[in-house]
UniProtKB/Swiss-Prot annotation:
Disulfide bonds: none annotated. Transmembrane segments: none annotated. It catalyses: ATP + H2O + cellular proteinSide 1 = ADP + phosphate + cellular proteinSide 2. Monomer and homodimer. Part of the essential Sec protein translocation apparatus which comprises SecA, SecYEG and auxiliary proteins SecDF-YajC and YidC. PANTHER family: CHLOROPLAST PROTEIN-TRANSPORTING ATPASE, SECA INNER MEMBRANE COMPONENT OF SEC PROTEIN SECRETION SYSTEM. Residues 866-876 have a biased composition (Basic and acidic residues). It is a peripheral membrane protein. GO terms for molecular function: ATP binding; metal ion binding; protein-exporting ATPase activity. ATP binds at residues 87, 105-109, 507. The lineage of its organism: Bacteria, Pseudomonadati, Pseudomonadota, Gammaproteobacteria, Legionellales. Its cofactor is Zn(2+). Zn(2+) binds at residues 880, 882, 891-892. This is Protein translocase subunit SecA.
Length: 896
């Protein structure tokens, strides 16, 4: 009651926003006579003037009125299109970082030019996001004359562009492209090996066309770049045959090729073992005569040897794994249960498969992934436009913090939306649809029949064929052809069947597309021929208006009211006449699940017979209530999933920030020194635990690990024998000094610049490998975390806790691996230092799979996330986003 009273007194939030913006419209209109008086050169010079004023301290908001007036005048001169006042309001809504709901035919493509131009003045770039490549190319070409007149550059991105072409496109002031392409380019940039390989600039301002489709419908499925792991089956098999020839060292001081550490579940080659395996590898022609296994070019070979040794020495059949159906299945050491689908990482699983003689699987690995909600939230400012957003306004506000502003139409809407007709059976419903289509055909009224699935559209097509009714079928497979058919769907007597999502972005013009007719004329067509085409189009246009405009028939209600409204919105553009009606049956999915009992009992009470429909506003209201419930359910699901996504996203931000910092470094000495100190401290703490008695120490094992893994000769037992009062901190100091001395010898051989390049390559390669394995671990954690609910634990909190633990472990392992490789690999020349980078680049050339499973036509709304970057770049003294409470530099920022 109170909210209704306040609305009556002050107007709704939407009305207040529109009233505020109407004042700005008056200011823009006041500039119009001045703009009309300017020459083309003077008008084009406005851009430079605005840039200078912006650089001198004027804000974009202060420039808005004059800039919008400039664009309107240029649009009229170049395209013959003048922005309506309501389009100016739409442009202001987008500039403020909100969503403009504008009906079909209200010129959203033209509206985008206003905020795009204004925000391009800052020089930081604008991305306009479309749902398919056809629309990106069409819209960029269509609006290009406006931007080029004003001295701005326009780029368009699409798949299969060369790297150089894409870099050039992104340098443009205004870039058009699809949501998929922007997302994949972001992921590829964060897999690049140097800053010069990146294509994207700052993610500054995005204008998302069909924002509901991208931020809600498509948000559920992530963008994934996956790559087939390199097929090393033959190498695993060859090395597997060599390992049984190695002999285990039983006691300290005995002969043997390798030792085992059961506590750490590790196996290490001894000095004799190194020589022996090098000899065996040389005989097998896997190593050149006289070459060391620890040469920089043999890092991958060393990795395979370590995996094979571990598989033979530490992993035993029917204890650690079983062989079932010709596959190696892991056994959980805690529960004794098998874990189908789980695989050991770092090549260990393949090494065990080679040992057991079963087929070696090279699975696809996820190299990088991101959801649209997490990608678009990184923009400094995000806005969107669509014909149908108001029904999802709560979700946009709650999850993206985006306001939806409903923009009034330029002309009054006169479309007639008729009440739903409900039948007992689907057969009755389809028969009624056929009759409606036939009646429209008699009066030559164009019809668009919307279906919820491709299957339904093809079934209806078969029924129309039986009745000899000529029609076109659209099911969103070929965008360019689709746009052409949709454009012609307004011709007299045209019948078009389309899935609900088909043809978004293209208007159905009554009488057909005049632009298409003119384009079909020969290039040298005379004015008379053009005039004849225009007259013919006008005749068709008038005929369709006389017949009642476009008729919309819905063959079933969708789970979302928004999709139903999209279908209805095809008719009644720019004040055109039109009508719409939905035909339903009690056998439809939505009716069967939610409304069938109530409606069926109502039909029985009214004595309805098969073939007879029920038409009542109560029925329509009951159906819409069912849709609201379902929308609420989907929103809750998306919100839940979003909470999980945010955990992974925080980790991604940390990794990508560190990665970019490392790529930008010319000298990595400080980073490596910090890592080395942490790794050595951690090693000492493992074998000589803090606050422990000397009896609990294992100095020999510590010496062995330092020797085997890091090639550091540290006689820790001797130090303790000589001085029983020695403290762990002193041992750490001595080990670190030896590690530095050992590494400094390598630096002296080839020089600091060469070593820095090698260090950077090793850090990036190791980071990428560990991040890839971490993504798989996070996925496995996510799949089973809901079971914690049965133990009265909050799955979300458990997921955060375990994800943090996994992330910390991953970074610890990463540092250990980097220092191990840098300590053990031999670098003799500058060429050796470039080997890793060359291997890495070769890996990147391998074809990567780009995956984004778009929702099928009958899939429902989806995941979502927030709007305008509320998190600035992570500062060294800011709290770490992982949630530990520590400063970033003391937590996950310690890598950089």
């Amino acid at each position: 009651m109170l909210s209704t009273l306040i609305k009556k007194m002050f107007g709704s939030r939407n009305e207040r926003t529109l009233r505020r913006m109407e004042k700005s419209v008056m200011a823009i209109n006041a500039f119009e006579p001045k703009m009309q008086a300017l020459s083309n050169e003077e008008l084009a010079g406005k851009t430079q003037e605005f840039k200078e004023r912006f650089n001198n301290g004027e804000s974009l908001d202060e420039l808005l009125a004059e800039a919008f007036a400039t664009v309107r005048e240029v649009s009229l001169r170049t395209l013959g299109l003048r922005h309506f006042d309501v389009q100016l309001i739409g442009g202001m809504v987008l500039h403020e970082g909100n969503i403009a709901e504008m009906r079909t035919g209200e010129g959203k493509t033209l509206v985008a030019t206003l905020p795009a131009y204004l925000n391009a003045i800052s020089g930081r770039g604008v991305h306009i996001v479309t749902v398919n490549d056809y629309l990106a190319k069409r819209d960029s070409q269509w609006m290009k004359p406006i931007y080029e007149f004003l001295g701005l550059t326009v780029g368009v991105i699409y798949p299969d562009m060369s790297h150089k072409e894409k870099q050039e496109a992104y340098k443009a002031d205004i870039v058009y492209g699809t949501n998929n392409e922007y997302g994949f380019d972001y992921l590829r940039d964060n897999m690049a090996f140097s800053l010069t390989d990146k294509v994207q600039r700052e993610l500054n301002f995005a204008i998302v066309d069909e924002v509901d489709s991208i931020l809600i419908d498509e948000a559920r499925t992530p963008l994934i770049i996956s790559g087939a792991a390199e097929d090393s089956s033959e190498l695993y098999i060859k090395i597997n045959s060599l390992i049984p020839q190695l002999k285990k060292q039983e006691e300290e001081g005995d002969e043997g090729d390798y030792t085992i550490d059961e506590k750490q579940k590790q196996a290490h080659l001894t000095d004799a073992g190194h020589l022996h395996i090098e000899e065996l590898l040389t005989k097998a022609k896997l190593l050149d005569p006289g070459e060391s296994l620890y040469h920089a070019s043999n890092i991958m070979l060393m990795h395979h040897v370590n995996a094979a040794l571990k598989a033979h020495a530490m992993f035993h059949r029917d204890i650690d794994y079983i062989v079932k159906d010709n596959q190696v299945v892991i056994v959980d050491e805690h529960t004794g249960r098998t874990m189908p689908g789980r695989r050991w990482s770092e090549g260990l699983h393949q090494a065990v498969e080679a040992k057991e003689g079963v087929p070696i699987q090279n699975e696809n690995q996820t190299l990088a992934s991101i959801t649209f909600q997490n990608f678009f939230r990184m923009y400094n400012k995000l806005s969107g436009m669509t014909g149908t957003a108001d029904t999802e306004a709560y979700e946009f506000q709650q999850i993206y913090n985006l306001e939806v502003v409903v923009i009034p139409t330029n002309r009054s809407m006169i479309r007639k939306d008729e009440a739903d007709l409900v039948y007992l059976t689907q057969a009755d419903k389809f028969q009624a649809i056929i009759e409606d289509v036939r009646e429209c055909g008699v009066r030559r009224q164009p019809v668009l029949v919307g279906t919820v699935s491709i299957e339904a559209s093809e079934f209806l097509s078969q029924l129309l064929k039986k009745e000899n009714i000529k029609h076109q079928v659209l099911n969103a497979k070929f965008h360019e052809k689709e746009a052409q058919i949709i454009a012609e769907a307004g011709r007299p007597g045209a019948v078009t069947i389309a899935t609900n999502m088909a043809g978004r972005g293209t208007d159905i013009v009554l009488g057909g597309s005049l632009a298409a007719d003119l384009a079909n004329l020969p290039a040298d067509a005379s004015e008379q021929e053009k005039e004849a085409v225009k007259k013919e189009w006008q005749k068709r246009h008038d005929e369709v208006i006389a017949a009642g405009g476009l008729r919309i028939i819905g063959s079933e209600r969708h789970e979302s009211r928004r999709i139903d409204n999209q279908l209805r919105g095809r008719a009644g553009r720019q004040g055109d006449p039109g009508s719409s009606r939905f035909y339903l049956s009690l056998e439809d999915n939505l009716m069967r699940i939610f409304a069938s009992e109530r409606v069926a009992s109502m039909m029985r009470r009214l004595g309805m017979q098969p073939g007879e429909p029920i038409e009542h506003s109560l029925v329509t209201r009951a159906i819409e209530n069912a849709q609201r419930k379902l929308e609420g359910h989907h929103f809750d699901v998306r919100k839940q999933l979003l909470d999980y996504d945010n955990v992974a996203n925080d980790q991604r931000q940390v990794i990508y920030t560190q990665r970019s910092s490392i790529m930008a470094m010319t000298d990595t000495q400080e980073v490596v020194e910090m890592m080395r100190e942490e790794v050595m401290d951690s090693l000492v703490d493992t074998y000589i635990p803090p606050q422990s008695l000397e009896d609990q120490w294992d100095p020999q094992a510590l010496s062995d690990v330092l020797s085997d893994e890091f090639k550091i000769k540290a006689p820790v037992p001797d130090w303790i024998d000589k001085d029983h009062s020695i403290q762990p901190e002193k041992i750490k100091e001595k080990i670190l000094a030896l590690a530095i001395e050992h590494y400094d010898e390598k630096v002296r051989k080839v020089g600091r610049p060469v070593i820095s390049q090698f260090e950077k390559s090793i850090i990036l390669q190791t980071l990428d490998n560990h991040w890839r394995e971490h993504l798989a671990a996070m996925d496995q954690l996510r799949q089973g975390i809901h079971l914690r609910g049965y133990a009265q634990k909050d799955p979300k909190q458990e997921y955060k806790k375990e994800a943090f633990s996994l992330f910390t472990m991953m970074l610890d392992n990463l540092k250990y691996e980097v220092i191990r490789i840098l300590s053990s690999v031999e670098i003799q020349t500058e060429e050796d230092a470039h080997v890793v980078e060359e291997q890495r680049r070769a890996d990147q050339i391998r074809k990567m799979n780009l995956m984004h499973e778009s929702l099928s036509e009958n899939d429902e709304a989806s995941e979502t996330q927030t709007f305008r970057r509320q998190e600035k770049k992570i500062g060294r003294n800011d709290p770490c986003p992982c949630g530990s409470g520590k400063k970033y530099k003391a937590c996950h920022g310690s890598l950089v």
